[in-house]
Regions:
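Bacterial Sec-dependent N-terminal signal peptides
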Residues: 1-26, 575
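Outer-membrane beta-barrel translocator/receptor signature
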Residues: 40, 52-61, 67-153, 238
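Short charge-dense sequence patches
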Residues: 12, 57-58, 62, 255
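Hydrophobic alpha-helical membrane-insertion segments
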Residues: 11-14, 71, 398, 405
Length: 575
């Protein structure tokens, strides 16, 4: 029972986090991360434009880029985003994955639009011109769909819910009392749909995917279950930028942005399981009149849907210097952004039996929660070499310090130790570190009106793990789960950290056309390859096998391999 109680506490802790939305380190990184899109030209150059400037898509990377162009601009960039994900299923552990199922999903996008105006001072030296701009650049696309299938007789999601509910009084899971008892709505929705129920005396629960031993001493999964896990994401993040630039003698260019990022991020997760042989999953219901009815478990499903709407503000300053012909140097620094985020979420569950009279479904109320998030600061540096007006090569380096991410209540009060985000922010401080991003781009002008472009980028993960004083390897989830009981009291402390070796890589290419008049058009494509990820659709839990031996009922693992294609067409006018 001790092990079950520990599991129950962990499950309830994780569920409580879900009840108040999704405020953990990984969510903060997801919101904070910028993957610049912009115009088709900057995308084709791998966004290695810190020292180049001129293009409207570069202003979000280096505000000084607006001062480089000595003409007004009006541009719009429609595009398409194609998510390609391969998913495979393993019934236990991170080995033995089955066949990979591939899925792609296409969405229309608008990576960029905007306009700039140049005002000349009439001077030939010193401050020659001012530039004002209003631009929208896309900085993230949440386009993702993954689906995996497999069979297992080792565990089930319905049984995991039953294990998580162990020790809870059944009256707390029914009716309107669920509003006030502090139990997570995922457990309540699963119970009210019939995914698990009580048996024997006391607060003992069993999943409808399990069989109870004749002695009533233990329960287990009696046969194979066909399982199906689906995850999808949608939405985008965009920065509306108010830009101001200054040109000093065509040698030094300075710019400042006030950015207003806004985003919608949607996440949906669905899990289905069904009996391969229903006769192996008998269910006996005790009716109020004392009689019994036997039926068979057919299938169950559980899903949660989460949507976050965000808006924020930040500032960014930048400079580009041309010390002598051919060489260009650029640098920019962005302040942390302060976001206000409002989340909505809901759980749904269904259960189906051979006798449809006992089938059920349940939906939780829709939850809502608002809070603030401070994102990291970032700094980028660039160097470029131009070969007259025929070609250039550019290299960028960007640094982002995720350890400064902090969640805040909208209306905080009390001592810092009473901050509901104190443990999460400590996790951010220790387990989110510095991410590095290297970008390379080149352009070759074949004729006065036609150019070829290519780029490459590689970015490191900011996530790290530690060794503690006990010699254990500690992840962010481990630290958060044990923070109050061990790390806050000093019984355990972190000793040495290491970064994971994950890399996100991108390859880009494109072409450009410039007419003799004001019209121009660019076409660009980017292929981004993300690190492989392993996903658990439910928690591991303690259970028994058919002989009554204690076992660790492990959740299946889902391996996802993800790539994202983005193709954009910029049309614009210079005047």
């Amino acid at each position: 029972m001790k092990a079950i109680k520990i599991l129950c506490a962990a499950a309830l802790m994780a569920a409580t986090a879900a009840v108040s939305g999704a405020q953990n380190m990984y969510d903060a990184i997801n919101i904070s991360r910028n993957e610049y899109y912009g115009t088709a030209r900057t995308m084709a150059l791998g966004n290695a434009v810190t020292a180049i400037g001129g293009d409207v898509g570069s202003f979000g990377i280096n505000p000084a880029g607006s001062a480089v162009a000595n003409y007004n601009q009006l541009v719009i960039t429609p595009g398409i985003s194609v998510s390609v994900v391969g998913a495979s299923y393993s019934p236990s552990g991170e080995s033995g994955f089955g066949p990979e199922y591939g899925y792609d999903r296409t969405r229309m996008t608008l990576p960029n639009f905007g306009a700039t105006a140049v005002l000349y001072t009439g001077r030939s030296r010193g401050l020659k011109s001012f530039t004002f701009g209003l631009i929208s650049n896309q900085t993230a696309q949440y386009n993702y769909y993954a689906d995996a299938y497999g069979q297992t007789s080792l565990s089930s999601k319905a049984a995991e819910f039953a294990a998580a509910a162990a020790g809870l009084d059944e009256s707390m899971l029914v009716g309107n009392s669920a509003y006030d008892n502090g139990i997570s709505w995922d457990i309540i929705s699963a119970y009210q749909s019939g995914m698990f129920g009580s048996y024997g005396k006391g607060s003992n629960y069993v999943g409808v995917t399990e069989t109870i031993d004749e002695s009533g001493a233990w329960h287990y999964v009696p046969g194979p279950l066909a399982q199906h896990s689906a995850v999808q994401k949608w939405g985008s993040k965009n920065d509306v930028i108010v830009n101001f630039g200054m040109n000093f003698s065509d040698k030094v260019f300075f710019g400042i942005n006030v950015g207003f990022p806004y985003a919608t991020y949607g996440y949906s997760e669905s899990f289905y399981e069904s009996s391969v042989n229903p006769e192996q999953f008998p269910i006996i219901y005790n009716l109020d009149d004392g009689s019994q009815v036997e039926t068979y478990f057919l299938s169950s499903s559980f899903s949660n849907r989460y949507i976050a709407d965000m808006s924020g503000i930040y500032a960014k300053i930048g400079v580009i210097v041309t010390p002598f012909e051919g060489l260009r140097l650029g640098a920019a620094i962005q302040t942390p952004a302060m976001y206000t985020i409002t989340e909505h979420w809901q759980y749904s569950a269904t259960t189906s039996f051979a006798d449809d009279y006992f089938s059920g479904y349940a939906n939780s109320p829709e939850g809502e929660y608002s809070y603030n998030l401070m994102t990291p600061y970032s700094a980028n540096f660039g160097v470029a070499w131009t070969f007259g007006d025929r070609a250039f090569v550019s290299v960028d380096y960007e640094l982002t310090d995720y350890s400064v991410m902090r969640y805040h209540e909208l209306h905080p009060g009390g001592a810092p130790m009473n901050d509901i985000f104190f443990d999460v922010n400590e996790t951010n401080r220790h387990f989110a570190g510095v991410a590095h991003n290297l970008r390379i781009g080149a352009e070759l002008r074949l004729t006065p009106g036609f150019s070829l472009r290519a780029g490459y980028g590689v970015a490191t993960s900011p996530v790290r793990h530690w060794t503690n004083n006990m010699g254990d390897d500690v992840t962010a989830d481990d630290f958060l789960a044990e923070y109050e009981d061990y790390y806050l009291s000093g019984l355990k402390y972190l000793v040495d950290s290491r970064y994971y070796g994950d890399r996100t890589r991108s390859l880009s290419f494109g072409v450009g056309f410039s007419s003799r008049g004001s019209f121009f058009a660019d076409l660009g494509a980017v292929l981004t390859s993300y690190p492989d990820s392993v996903f658990m659709p439910y928690y591991d839990y303690d259970n028994f096998d058919a002989e009554g031996n204690p076992v660790n009922a492990a959740s299946p693992r889902i391996l996802n391999r993800s790539k994202l294609w983005n193709v954009a067409l910029t049309i614009g006018w210079r005047f």
